[in-house]
């Protein structure tokens, strides 16, 4: 079994994946994009008869899927699968699954951080410091 993992978020769990896949004698290849994702043409270039893809936001369209003759399963790291041509996959017996809730913690943390940033005027302070000014709110004491 050959597996291609392109989702950058999986890099921190690489040792766990390696241990898990070694139990199944799977050949795992990690290729991460320099930016957020691979486009369809880049996916064609890195695909090498893998049976399973674990992807992030990579473009998995009909152009790529036509060249992926050995592909049997696509796993989307995260909830949304709008980057995957699901109709083509259904018609060609390629199963697609996702991992809803996997990124929920990170989305929640980011949301709280943005709220805190607004509450503390962090961006206003960054802008004023970059302009050579020091914005200081009046003291309440």
Task: Describe the residue ranges of each PLM region.
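Rossmann-like dinucleotide/phosphate-binding beta-alpha-beta segment
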Residues: 1, 137-141
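Phosphate/diphosphate ligand-binding glycine-rich loop within oxidoreductases
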Residues: 51-130, 140-141
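N-terminal glycine-/charge-rich "phosphate-binding" loop or analogous flexible N-terminal tail
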Residues: 1-50
């Amino acid at each position: 079994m050959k597996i291609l993992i392109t989702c950058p978020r999986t890099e921190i769990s690489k040792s766990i994946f390696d241990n898990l896949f070694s139990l199944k004698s799977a050949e795992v290849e990690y290729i991460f994009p320099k930016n957020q994702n691979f486009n369809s043409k880049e996916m064609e270039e890195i695909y090498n008869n893998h049976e399973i893809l674990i992807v992030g936001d990579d473009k998995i369209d009909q152009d790529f899927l036509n060249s992926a003759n050995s592909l049997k399963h696509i796993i989307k790291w995260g909830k949304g699968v709008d980057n995957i041509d699901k109709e083509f996959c259904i018609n060609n017996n390629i199963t697609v699954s996702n991992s809803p809730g996997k990124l929920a913690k990170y989305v929640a943390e980011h949301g709280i951080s943005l709220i805190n940033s607004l509450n503390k005027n962090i961006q206003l302070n960054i802008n004023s410091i970059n302009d050579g000014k020091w914005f200081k709110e009046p003291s309440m004491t």
